């Protein structure tokens, strides 16, 4: 089998310390804020010349938490309730031969920093903190937007959105600039498809806080917010 080597050019800095709760697709929670920090050998600002003229980017990255688990020819997509198997190449499962992810994200700004050189501030990313990034490309509407596209099983899959009950006293414990994103993440039902007990208390690690919640029917209720 042929093999190739590939370099990590950057890492994502995000509010997700673990993979639990990360949106299942990029762009679902636009209020999420993250930063792309380049590795030292790729901090030449010339490599980013002109990138500020694009509103969105494609990033190619590694499902680093799935590498140890290998790949499977069939997987159970969460949007099908975790009960139906589909071919891995017909899904976006992390359990792939090369563990590569592809995300479309919004470019919010380009900043020159003293410590890390030029960094990219982005919105709507679905990556864990520290995720390795292999490449960045501009999103080009005339070539990347297919108005006649069909979405396979995702076109008919159910809506996983939940109503979030976040008591004001608990919400106020989060930094103001993280509140909308936290609610957005919770509304997309972070629970695994195989864990849906209304009695279970779940914990979401987000932005340095442990957000504990329960779910009954279609309502997610936050029970506790703890600073880590």
Task: List each language-model region with its residue ranges.
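Mixed-charge, low-complexity intrinsically disordered regions
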Residues: 1-100, 112-228
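Conserved positions in beta-strands of structured domains
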Residues: 13, 105-108
